[in-house]
Amino acid sequence: MEQIAARVTYINLSPDELIQHAVKNGEGVLSSTGALAVTTGKRTGRSPKDRFIVKDEQTADQVAWGNINQPVEQRTFDQLWERALRYLSERAVYISHLQVGADDNYFLPLKVVTEFAWHNLFACDLFIRPSGDHANGKPSWVILSAPGLKTDPERDGVNSDGAVMINLSQRRVLFVGMPYAGEMKKAMFSVLNYLLPPHDVLPMHCAANAGQSGDVALFFGLSGTGKTTLSADPHRFLIGDDEHGWSATSVFNFEGGCYAKCIDLSQEREPMIWNAIRHGAIMENVVLDENGVPDYADARLTQNSRAAYPREHIPLRVENNRGRPPDAVLFLTCDLDGVLPPVALLTKEQAAYYFLSGYTALVGSTEVGSVKGVTSTFSTCFGAPFFPRPPTVYAELLMKRIEATGCQVYLVNTGWTGGAYGEGGERFSIPTTRAIVNAVLSGKLKEGPTEVLSGFNLTIPKSALGVDDHLLNPRKTWEDVSAYDARAQRLIQKFRENFEKFKVPAAIREAGPSDVH
């Protein structure tokens, strides 16, 4: 176990104690909700250009190196790790012993060492607090977080004044100059996404919940497309809102908490999230008024305002943080072109095609420096920034799991219809999408009459309880059918161009869109 020398060391403080320290240290203030409110300066989202993975003998042939998984030498990592240790040795540090992964076979013990008390609270909220000594002899991973230490690109071999470095061989993750706490959870997500596939576990960027009878649903999607909102269902039990593993026998949460977007949060539309933001939670970059009341509509700090809270703040939750293999898998796509249906039933090959494509939109992007507003993107596996191995590794595991369980996969458009974004189209309302999801989870959607949507070759239902029939076929929602066809053809061409980079069996390639006719 890594020994940490510091001026003062606080070990395994309770959330209450960490909140007291954070307020006393001037790291944040208590809001009217009871949640701790903090700000993170210029870094209000992830910094993908500042994220590196150590390239060594173990990882050289296993990681898909490039702009997402940037390589860094062991020597460069070691020098910065030592600099961070020296920096922290002159300060008070906070240490918590946690774990990631709710499955006894696949969890990782985790030692979190932070300069800020609120970063340690974030780790306690988002990771899993084990009961007793639960390491079972497993070697522990170590997170070192020194947001007050800045990097020098020339001296430290990095790109800016901050860096995230993941050392998969040494089980170390380093954060320097990174006040945005979301970096911590996504770094450990990347670690599990690297480690689990050789153990026949599919890691997934998805939310998961369970019905009264134990039936499990998975919601894949990028930030802002509806994972957290749709999985926080008043009639179902939450497993988790963002990161899960799918083994041969179960679905299990990687985390012990939720990290919800707060922009335009409404008590009426999202009561479970609203009520979870209370004492013990953290509000990150949420604007407060002079009375400490949060204004969730105020985006002056960022569109990516967040709340971190433990699963215990959600009354309807699966206690053991896991469930059986899924009965339904939903790919949430936010279509800005307004040409995809609100729901489609996918074959196994189509599931692999749309999983690899990961077509969606960046809605209030989680990345620093992103363009304000909304832009479309193809994000492999519905989470390209977090998957270190080649994408086909994950796609093959997905097909294997679908084949073994026979679960139905659905494509659900939470984006626009009747026209494109900014060109007369309207976004599907949350109640409409919830009705679609309810129809999926009832099992009735796949039993009713269907038709095929030309061009995309998608099987779509002719009716769904609680949804206007005319919304189900996107071609019928456009006033000008020829304008729909032209826009659909344009998107189909984008799909084809994006898919050229994948080396996959013909059956998967042919499951994609063809020309509109």
UniProtKB/Swiss-Prot annotation:
InterPro entries, alphabetized: PEP_carboxykinase_ATP, PEP_carboxykinase_C, PEP_carboxykinase_N, PEPCK_ATP_CS
Pfam entry (one): PEPCK_ATP
SUPFAM superfamilies in UniProt: PEP carboxykinase N-terminal domain, PEP carboxykinase-like
Pathway: Carbohydrate biosynthesis; gluconeogenesis
Catalytic activity as recorded in UniProt: oxaloacetate + ATP = phosphoenolpyruvate + ADP + CO2
Cofactor(s), by name: Mn(2+)
Keywords assigned by UniProt, alphabetized: ATP-binding, Cytoplasm, Decarboxylase, Gluconeogenesis, Lyase, Manganese, Metal-binding, Nucleotide-binding
Molecular function terms, GO-annotated: ATP binding; metal ion binding; phosphoenolpyruvate carboxykinase (ATP) activity
UniProt binding sites for ATP: 186, 205, 221-229, 270, 306, 433
Residues annotated as binding substrate: 46, 180, 186, 306
Enzyme Commission number, as recorded: 4.1.1.49
GO CC terms in record: cytosol
Top EC category: lyase
GO BP annotations, alphabetical order: gluconeogenesis
Details of cofactor binding: Binds 1 Mn(2+) ion per subunit.
Protein's cellular compartments: Cytoplasm
Residues where Mn(2+) binds: 186, 205, 242
Subunit comment: Monomer.
Role, per record: Involved in the gluconeogenesis. Catalyzes the conversion of oxaloacetate (OAA) to phosphoenolpyruvate (PEP) through direct phosphoryl transfer between the nucleoside triphosphate and OAA.
Alphabetized PANTHER family for the sequence: PHOSPHOENOLPYRUVATE CARBOXYKINASE (ATP) (PTHR30031:SF0), PHOSPHOENOLPYRUVATE CARBOXYKINASE ATP (PTHR30031)
Similarity comment text for this entry: Belongs to the phosphoenolpyruvate carboxykinase (ATP) family.
Protein name from the UniProt record: Phosphoenolpyruvate carboxykinase (ATP)
Naturally occurring in which organism (per UniProt): Coxiella burnetii (strain CbuK_Q154)
Lineage: Bacteria, Pseudomonadati, Pseudomonadota, Gammaproteobacteria, Legionellales
Gene name in the database record: pckA
